[in-house]
């Protein structure tokens, strides 16, 4: 089956969509991606053919599907609406798998919500009658190193681990770290695409209790070596749940609200930073 992922990444959007798509992509043998070449994107790190799009036009995507005869379109993109999905289906007949994080209407054959809070009943009346709904933690897309790390009982090197995603455009990592006691050893994980990286590096230099990890190869191990995690209410939550870690989730964008609400109801520590 020829599979096309439609997804983007950038220093503004972050890396979460592409990262989880790459985990799902391993389930298929013939995979390609269609992405806009945005600033700070992960296009060069995608180990599959990438079609660089010229625009957000749905017709450009439709033409690509027709020309390359893709059989399954996987949409992981907040900018593609239910009406766009209807148009794609009408024009191409392609099978559609749609990611969803906000309990929104979709016109798809398979609906995938990988967040722990999600239930199939949430989508009654929101998706076509014959749509296959895949929801909840059992469908979580978690990298293999987390499953391996969940078996390890590591010595705790760090009092706190902070990660606000790969880009952390609001520079929350620095803000959170500066509010913690200076007697505590704090690890901060980020990426070289973080627009606030220089500020973080300067902060780490001035504080000998801070350990800054940039593009670290094994985030799972870092998390497992920490007494408490302070993480965004994103896919990091599924990873923390798998590790059975002590964590606090920070909600700072709208698409994290459902996860944050569910965590709070379950008794987990949640903080909102808008």
Swiss-Prot record:
This is UDP-2,4-diacetamido-2,4,6-trideoxy-beta-L-altropyranose hydrolase. GO terms for molecular function: hydrolase activity. It is an enzyme of class 3 (hydrolase). It catalyses: UDP-2,4-diacetamido-2,4,6-trideoxy-beta-L-altrose + H2O = 2,4-diacetamido-2,4,6-trideoxy-beta-L-altrose + UDP + H(+). Belongs to the PseG family. Keywords: Hydrolase. The lineage of its organism: Bacteria, Pseudomonadati, Campylobacterota, Epsilonproteobacteria, Campylobacterales. InterPro entries: PseG (IPR020023). The keyword ATP-binding does not apply. Its EC number is 3.6.1.57. Monomer. The active site is at 17 (proton acceptor). It comes from the Bacteria. Substrate binds at residues 15-16, 143, 234-235, 239. Nucleotide sugar hydrolase that catalyzes the fourth step in the biosynthesis of pseudaminic acid, a sialic-acid-like sugar that is used to modify flagellin. The gene is pseG.
């Amino acid at each position: 089956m020829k599979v096309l992922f439609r997804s983007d990444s950038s220093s503004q959007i972050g890396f979460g969509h592409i990262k989880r798509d790459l985990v799902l992509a391993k389930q298929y043998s013939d995979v390609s991606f269609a992405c806009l070449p945005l600033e700070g994107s992960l296009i060069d790190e995608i180990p599959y053919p990438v079609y660089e799009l010229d625009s957000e036009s749905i017709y450009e995507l439709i033409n690509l599907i027709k020309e390359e005869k893709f059989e399954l379109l996987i949409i992981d993109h907040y900018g593609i609406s239910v009406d766009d999905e209807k148009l794609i289906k009408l024009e191409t007949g392609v099978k559609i798998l749609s990611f969803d994080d906000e309990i929104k209407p979709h016109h798809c054959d398979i609906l995938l919500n990988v967040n722990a809070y999600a239930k199939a009943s949430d989508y009654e009346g929101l998706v076509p009658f014959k749509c296959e709904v895949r929801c909840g933690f059992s469908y979580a897309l978690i990298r293999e190193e987390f499953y391996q790390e969940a078996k390890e009982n590591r010595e705790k090197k760090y009092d706190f681990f902070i990660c606000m995603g790969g880009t952390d455009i609001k520079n929350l990592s620095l803000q959170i770290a500066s509010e913690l006691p200076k007697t505590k050893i704090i690890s901060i994980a980020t990426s070289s695409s973080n627009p606030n990286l220089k500020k973080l590096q300067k902060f780490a230099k001035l504080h000998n209790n801070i350990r800054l990890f940039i593009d670290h190869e094994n985030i799972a191990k870092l998390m497992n070596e920490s007494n408490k995690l302070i993480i965004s209410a994103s896919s990091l939550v599924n990873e923390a749940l798998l590790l059975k870690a002590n964590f606090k989730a920070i909600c700072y964008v709208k698409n994290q609200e459902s996860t944050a609400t569910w965590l709070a109801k379950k008794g987990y520590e949640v903080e909102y930073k808008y």
